[in-house]
């Protein structure tokens, strides 16, 4: 989440909202956000949803029962303004997300939505 916070201005520049979700409690989120601030000075500039019963996480396939039925896996969902899930990225718990690739995907989707040209690699 720190990487997303650091890249927040780039997401804003491409008209993209960020939202975090976990099945931890509000108090757990507040303590975690406080720890991040105390250790790094970073304030998370986007909301974090406390999905206590896991209903949202289950609907989006974020809980891998073969790993744990109480922890979400690291997912990134790119959802367009119509509410359509356009991209799902699933990361192992021990691998961080690659923010430049996420930004590239969003920009590629935005560009391809406005033209009939495919977006090349790299």
Please state what every model-predicted region is.
Residues 1-122:
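Chalcogenol-based redox active-site neighborhoods
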